[in-house]
A protein has these predicted regions:
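Signature of exported/secreted
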Residues: 25-350
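Bacterial N-terminal signal peptides that target proteins for export
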Residues: 1-10
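C-terminal motif of bacterial Sec signal peptides marking the signal peptidase cleavage site
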Residues: 19-22
Length: 350
C-alpha cells in the first residue's frame, strides 16, 4: 500500500522504529524475581510492580474487547537529490500523507492474540516536486471525487476506503496477520473495468498486498521486549536490512523514561535512538560500480503508551539519511547526493 518517494530508503527508515522485538540485548537486565513486589489496583495494574530495585513494567498490549481506538497518522517525507539526472541541480520532493482510521477490538484469544477490525475513514496526500525554476504540486483527498481521485496512482487508496478488514496482533505489539481484504481487491478490479485476467489480478494483489498494509499499521503498534523493564533502564536490538542496494545493520536503542499513574491509569514514555552501520560501501554488478563516499544517518523517537487501555496514545519519530554515491562504468564516473528526512506523528484521537 502507499507509494513513497525513494521507496527503498523510506522502508528502512520507517520500519526502523516500528520493528521492536524482545530478542534485543539489554544494557540493563530486568529482574523478573517477584519477591517483595508491590502491585497497584485497577485494570492491568499487574503490569506495574514495585520492588527493592525500583518500578518494573511488563510491556504488554492488553485492550478490552469492543474497545474502539481512532487514530490520525501523519507521515512527512522530504527528498533532496543532486545528480546528472536532475541536471546537477537540486531536485526537492515532498510527500505529506494523513491517514484517519479506526481499530475495534474484535476478539482476544486465550493466548492474548488480539484481533482488530480496521477501517480507513480518510486519506489525504500532498505531493510536491520542485527545482530552482519550476514546481509541481498535487493534492489527493479520498473524500473528494475530483480529477485527481480517478488517477491510477490512487486506485489503492480509493479501494480501501470504509472497507473493514482485520489485523491480528500479539501481546508484544507485532502484527502477525492481515486478512479480510477480499472487498478491497474487488473494488480495485472494478475500478479497472474488470479487464484483468487471473495472473494480472494476482500481480495487482501482490503489489498492494497484506505486507504493504501491515507495514503502515505496524508504525502505530509499538513492539515490546519479552522481559519486564525497570524505569530508566535500556534495551537494544540490531538487525540487518538494506538502504538502496547497500547492506546495513540498524542499531536500535530504547529507554523507559517515565511511568505515571493518574486517574487510575498507568502511562509510560519510551525514548528511542537509531544508528546505521553500512556493512558494505561498494557494490559491483556487470555494468557498474556503486560506492558510498559519504553517509550520515540516524533518527530519534518517543512513544507514549497507556498500559491500562492497552494502546499507543502518541508517537513521534524522525529519521535522516544523507548519502553521497559515486557511480563508475567504462572508465567514467558521476556523483550523486541524496538527503531523505522523514517525520512520523501518530495521535490517538479517541
Amino acid at each position: 500500500m502507499f507509494r513513497n518517494i525513494s521507496k527503498e530508503i523510506l522502508f528502512v527508515l520507517f520500519i526502523s522504529f516500528t520493528v521492536l522485538t524482545g530478542c534485543g540485548k539489554k544494557e540493563d537486565s530486568a529482574d523478573i524475581n517477584t519477591k517483595n513486589e508491590k502491585k497497584s489496583g485497577g485494570v492491568n495494574s499487574d503490569l506495574v510492580v514495585k520492588d527493592d530495585k525500583g518500578t518494573k513494567v511488563t510491556l504488554d498490549l492488553r485492550p478490552k474487547k469492543n474497545d474502539v481506538f481512532k487514530y490520525k497518522m501523519n507521515a512527512l517525507t522530504t527528498s533532496k537529490e543532486i545528480s546528472p539526472m536532475s541536471g546537477d541541480k537540486e531536485l526537492v520532493s515532498t510527500q505529506d500523507i494523513n491517514y484517519y482510521y479506526s481499530e475495534e477490538v474484535n476478539d482476544i484469544g486465550s493466548s492474548g492474540i488480539i484481533t482488530y477490525k480496521v477501517k480507513f475513514d480518510s486519506i489525504n496526500i500532498t505531493s510536491t516536486v520542485s527545482s530552482s525554476d519550476s514546481s509541481v504540486k498535487m493534492y489527493y483527498n479520498s473524500n473528494v471525487k475530483d480529477s485527481v481521485y480517478g488517477k491510477p496512482d490512487f486506485i489503492q487508496y480509493n479501494s480501501i476506503m470504509n472497507e473493514e478488514f482485520f489485523a491480528r496482533v500479539t501481546p508484544k505489539g507485532e502484527i502477525s496477520e492481515i486478512y479480510g481484504l477480499e472487498k478491497v481487491y474487488e473494488n480495485m478490479f472494478k475500478s479497472l473495468g474488470d479487464t484483468l485476467d487471473a495472473a494480472q489480478k494476482e500481480s495487482l494483489k501482490s503489489s498492494f498486498g497484506k505486507e504493504a498494509i501491515q507495514a503502515v499499521l505496524q508504525q502505530q503498534f509499538q513492539m515490546f521486549p519479552d522481559a519486564a523493564v525497570y524505569k530508566d533502564s535500556s534495551w537494544t536490538r540490531s538487525y540487518e536490512t538494506q538502504i538502496m542496494i547497500f547492506p546495513v545493520r540498524n542499531i536500535l536503542s530504547y529507554r523507559l523514561n517515565d511511568i505515571k499513574e493518574e486517574n487510575n491509569q498507568f502511562t509510560i514514555k519510551i525514548d528511542a535512538d537509531l544508528a546505521v552501520d553500512f556493512m558494505k560501501k561498494e557494490i559491483k554488478d556487470e555494468k557498474m560500480t556503486y560506492k558510498i563516499e559519504d553517509a550520515k544517518t540516524g533518527g530519534k523517537g518517543t512513544v507514549e503508551f497507556n498500559l491500562t487501555r492497552g494502546c499507543v496514545t502518541a508517537k513521534q519519530t524522525s529519521t535522516n539519511i544523507d548519502i553521497g554515491i559515486k557511480l563508475s562504468a567504462g572508465g567514467q564516473s558521476v556523483k550523486t547526493t541524496q538527503n531523505v528526512t522523514t517525520a512520523l506523528n501518530i495521535q490517538l484521537l479517541k
